Amino acid sequence: MTDTPAVDGNAVARIAAYAANLTYEDLTDLTVTRARQVVLDTLGTALGGNPTRLGRLAADYATTMQPGNEASLIADGRRTTVEGAAWANAVMAKHLGMDDAHRTCGHVAAELVPLALALGEYKHLDGRTLVTALAAGYDTIGAIQPAVNEPQRVKGLDQKGQSGTLASSITAGVLLGLDEEKMAHTLALSMDMACGTEQYVYDSGLCDTKDLLSGYAARNGIYAAKLAAFGFRGPPGALDGPYGYYLAFGDGFDPVYLNGIGNRFVLSETGFKPHAGCRYVHACVDATQELLKSGQPPLDDIVSIEIGTYEEAMTPNFRVNYRPENVGQAGFSLPVAVSVVLGRGSWYREDIEAYDEPEIRRLWPLVTVYM
């Protein structure tokens, strides 16, 4: 059977051609350095996520439901299938909320790095191939996520499970050595696996979805690449077609979205979170820590706290939650963040878990948030 080639020049074909032909030698020194940092950072976050309830549950599920000897679980020692390891390690890497953060592409490493490590281990690939695959994945999400970011936000759609899946498929395709045609089908097939909403921010603490979405993306990226390698085909218009991703999750396609492909490396632009929790509270955390440099005031003497911020940091309203019911909700809340940092000096997982201590809780209603 002869495969139908991907349509030349459309969005899927252009991204696929770029990824299939990208080499390690094409990358800038900063991109290579940042790739190393991203891998180490993700390993660290996964190590921290491993002993938690969700980390253990994910590891136990992967080894029970997907038994195999293809790849390792981080900090665990047990082995499972490639898909099982990528899924479980991605869940662990996401759980602490300390994964990387790109200004427009969001959190990417928790999806791509566990996938790359699992496939790299299984295929006995070298570090240069892994770095190249990560760069291709980041560039894919850089061509897609900025175009849909605002519409997704309004609709409550989740970036990790959606554009994260598309990026994961390209990273998997590079690691499997797919040619342009197979790469195009990989990306196209992954579009219909992109999923997820952010309802978990309202039901935080009552569900595990936030972290499972990273696992879905890592697993589905591998699945799409394997399907394409086996001969399955995806719709050539998966991105820019009449019912493609750009319109389904955004406002439609504009060729300008692809201008960055081959001209910049999104991986080199990603950053690392100095604090846990939602990155929209981090400016507030930094400002509070700066105030504390002149000495910590007695908490009983505080009568009011004002936070001047920007629209994205206080909308939707879960970001200004004065009555969080659990640690998950507390991690998104500006009033809680400033209260915790005033009391404890930092904003790591163990600090967020102390959100409900009486002297900290007294501060919550004293906070006014405004633009």
Region spans (language model):
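Well-ordered alpha-helical segments within folded domains of soluble proteins
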Residues: 109-117, 162-171, 218-223, 283, ...
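Aromatic-lined, polymer-binding surfaces characteristic
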Residues: 140-166, 214
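Hydrophobic alpha-helical hairpins/lids featuring a short glycine-rich hinge
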Residues: 90-146
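Structural helix-adjacent loops and short alpha-helical linkers that scaffold large soluble proteins
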Residues: 122-134, 177-184, 233-237
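Structured all-alpha helical bundle cores of eukaryotic regulatory proteins
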Residues: 152-155, 160-163, 183, 190, ...
